[in-house]
Amino acid sequence: MTMYERLMTLPIFKGVGTEQLSLFLEKTHLDFDNYEAGAVIQPLLEDCNGLKCVLTGRTEMVYTLSGGESRLVAEYGPGKVLGMERLFGMDTRPRHEVRALEPCGTMSFSKEQYMSLLRSNHICLINYLNYLNYHCQRIEVSMESLYSRSVAGTLAVIVSLMTDRDCRRIVLEGMDRLWATGPENAQADYDRQVDGLVDAGYVKFGNEGEIIIESRQSLLDYAESLQEQNR
């Protein structure tokens, strides 16, 4: 895959012609970096002052849940653009860390250069607005169509809100501790429901009680069907 072909797969350049992309590359100062497996690509709570595009390699995004009681780790392939949701607004510090799962290559450019691109290219502006719109709307969509008083519904809401559609694999750690703080029978009910999800193939167990979700969409579809049944 050529560099142009790789860049055309990035969501910020979706639908942009080769000539327009060439013009942007000619006018923009770009930083290219390489990361070894395990290296931090995006630190937690560091001010976002530009975009970083993952051109090669797999990454994982690590989120803390419930005040650190639990964690969600989401795996993504090449083509992820980091910083889009934190580039503007009152809080520009990402609430998750991004690490390299294998050697990764990135391309970065500043917020000012991206703003110049948005002013000069309406396709890129629409791409960015669509991205922000998706992130805003999925909150009410998730709560309306997925949430139910079940483990499947709770997991689906977390996954829907915290991960994107191109997520390859999700690992949830410490979810059992959330139910352990509930009523006396909550832990047993949690174990029973998770076992049912494992038997049905929606999740599987990892190390030390990890819940592994190989297909994000399958879990969301199942949770939505449960919500439909309860209406």
Question: Which stretches of residues belong to each language-model region?
Answer:
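A cytosolic small-molecule/anion-sensing beta-strand core signal
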Residues: 36, 55-56, 77, 102, ...
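A short beta-strand-loop-beta hairpin characteristic of the jelly-roll/cupin
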Residues: 59-71
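Phosphate-/nucleic-acid-contacting segments
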Residues: 160-231
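Cyclic-nucleotide recognition modules
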Residues: 72-130
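Short phosphate-coordinating micro-motif centered on Lys-Gly-acidic
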Residues: 40-46
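Glycine- and acidic-residue-biased ligand/ion/polar-headgroup-sensing regions
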Residues: 49-62, 78-79
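Cyclic nucleotide-binding regulatory module and flanking cytosolic helices
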Residues: 1-32, 36-37, 81, 86-89
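Polybasic "coupling" helices that flank or enter modular domains
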Residues: 122-185
